[in-house]
């Protein structure tokens, strides 16, 4: 079985998915808005177009005639995906999932209003005046996010009236596509944030990975660890909520479902219909198949063995500190750490805080995952990707 897969978005998550697909003999055409993106470096073919250009997407599909389209980013003209699906092309996990998750309004309203899941209180705004009114409605402190963005771009916490103008400007600078709108969320005093990787199958039950804990900074993940302790009743509720929202979206593939966790409560936060950045910890061998291999198997309809914890692990990001062409230093020191591994993504240009790689540390059964985080952070600190 050899499928031609059109990958829309070619970042580090797409690169690992492409490697997984290559290992099972699949053909990948990697698409991104710039040449030399990480997944393009390991794909059979590459294309450089704006995925918000519907005519350009139509031309790509006509040229390559893919069996499967796998979105890796949100900034896609999703109405075209619905048209391709109607023509018989498999869209992963489904065109409906891509359309609902390309902006936070659709997925939040689905979760909170249609499915009745517990979420933070929220309001929307598309002008500075409406934004000020939304903040007054929700109250301070609150969290502001563009309706369409990725990797934490444009997200901030507003704690005082004097922060409003800067928060609006920052959100507009971080938005993707042509949607100029924000969601204002109640600030929940959570104890931790978790990702529940959820695998849906065309034939077979929905599967769940052991919960992943993570820490955010500037709205973007900095470290993740697996497993994260969750009281059994709250884990059962997280699985119920993840199952409900993924069933509503349909299709087959992996979803990264995020939750806020407090002592005795859990809230649905966000969802990505693809491998999740915090799930890169699974590259440390924490489970029998990493998240990219799980995604591929679900996409192709291949058997998936029980997902169990093999060993605890942790990840820590390696960030750029300057601009220009990247030079990698410090690998020898980093890889001298027992149980450590490093993935350099191969992004061709630097900008401050851009994610250029990830440090991975695997432990032995029974090791404290949070102690592994400290080791992963130390490994990441030994690596520099600078001019």
UniProtKB/Swiss-Prot annotation:
Binding residues for N(1)-(5-phospho-beta-D-ribosyl)glycinamide: 12-13, 72, 277, 347, 354-355
InterPro entries found in the cross-reference section: ATP-grasp, ATP-grasp_carboxylate-amine, ATP_grasp_subdomain_1, PreATP-grasp_dom_sf, PurT, PurT/PurK_preATP-grasp, PurT_C, Rudment_hybrid_motif
EC annotation from Swiss-Prot or TrEMBL: 6.3.1.21
Binding residues annotated for Mg(2+), in chain numbering: 258, 270
Ranges of residues in domain ATP-grasp: 109-300
Enzyme class: ligase
Reaction catalysed by this enzyme: N(1)-(5-phospho-beta-D-ribosyl)glycinamide + formate + ATP = N(2)-formyl-N(1)-(5-phospho-beta-D-ribosyl)glycinamide + ADP + phosphate + H(+)
A biological process from GO: 'de novo' IMP biosynthetic process
Molecular function as annotated in GO: ATP binding; magnesium ion binding; phosphoribosylglycinamide formyltransferase 2 activity; phosphoribosylglycinamide formyltransferase activity
Pathway of action: Purine metabolism; IMP biosynthesis via de novo pathway; N(2)-formyl-N(1)-(5-phospho-D-ribosyl)glycinamide from N(1)-(5-phospho-D-ribosyl)glycinamide (formate route): step 1/1
Residues bound to ATP: 104, 145, 150-155, 185-188, 193
Any one annotated GO CC term: cytosol
Keyword NAD: no
Keywords: ATP-binding, Ligase, Magnesium, Metal-binding, Nucleotide-binding, Purine biosynthesis
One Pfam family hit: ATP-grasp
Oligomer status and interactors: Homodimer.
Function: Involved in the de novo purine biosynthesis. Catalyzes the transfer of formate to 5-phospho-ribosyl-glycinamide (GAR), producing 5-phospho-ribosyl-N-formylglycinamide (FGAR). Formate is provided by PurU via hydrolysis of 10-formyl-tetrahydrofolate.
HAMAP family: PurT
Family per similarity comment: Belongs to the PurK/PurT family.
Name of the featured protein: Formate-dependent phosphoribosylglycinamide formyltransferase
Protein's organism: Anaeromyxobacter dehalogenans (strain 2CP-C)
Recorded name of the encoding gene: purT
């Amino acid at each position: 079985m050899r499928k031609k897969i059109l990958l829309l978005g070619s970042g580090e998550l797409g690169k690992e998915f492409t490697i997984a697909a290559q290992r099972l003999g699949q053909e990948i055409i990697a698409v991104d808005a710039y040449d030399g993106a990480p997944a393009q470096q390991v794909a059979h073919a590459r294309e450089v177009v704006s995925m918000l250009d519907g005519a350009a997407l139509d031309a790509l599909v006509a040229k390559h005639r893919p069996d499967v389209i796998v979105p890796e980013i949100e900034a896609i003209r999703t109405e075209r995906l619905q048209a391709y699906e109607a023509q018989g092309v498999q869209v992963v996990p489904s065109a409906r999932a891509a359309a609902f998750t390309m902006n936070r309004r659709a997925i939040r309203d689905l979760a909170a209003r249609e499915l009745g899941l517990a979420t933070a209180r929220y309001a929307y705004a598309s002008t500075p005046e409406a934004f000020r009114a939304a903040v007054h409605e929700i109250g301070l402190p609150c969290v502001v996010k563009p309706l369409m963005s990725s990797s934490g771009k444009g997200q901030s916490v507003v704690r005082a009236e004097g922060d409003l103008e800067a928060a609006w400007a920052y959100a507009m600078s971080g938005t993707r596509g042509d949607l100029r709108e924000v969601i204002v969320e109640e600030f929940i005093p959570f104890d931790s944030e978790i990702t529940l990787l959820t695998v849906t199958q065309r034939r077979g039950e929905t599967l769940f990975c052991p919960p992943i804990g993570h820490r955010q900074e500037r709205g973007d993940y900095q470290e993740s660890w697996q497993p994260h302790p969750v009281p059994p009743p709250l884990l059962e509720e997280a699985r119920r909520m993840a199952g409900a929202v993924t069933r509503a979206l349909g299709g087959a593939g992996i979803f990264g479902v995020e939750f806020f966790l407090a002592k005795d409560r859990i809230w649905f936060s966000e969802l990505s219909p693809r491998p999740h950045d915090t799930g890169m910890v699974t590259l440390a061998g924490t489970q029998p198949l990493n998240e990219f291999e799980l995604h591929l198997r679900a996409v192709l309809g291949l058997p998936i063995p029980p997902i169990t914890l093999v060993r605890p692990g942790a990840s820590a990001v390696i960030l750029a500190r300057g601009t220009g062409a990247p030079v990698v230093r410090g690998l020898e020191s980093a890889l001298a750490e027992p149980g450590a591994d490093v993935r350099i993504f191969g992004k061709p240009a630097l900008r401050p805080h851009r994610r250029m790689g990830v440090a991975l540390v695997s432990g032995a059964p029974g090791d404290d995952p949070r102690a592994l985080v400290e080791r992963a952070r130390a490994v990441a600190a030994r690596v520099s990707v600078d001019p």
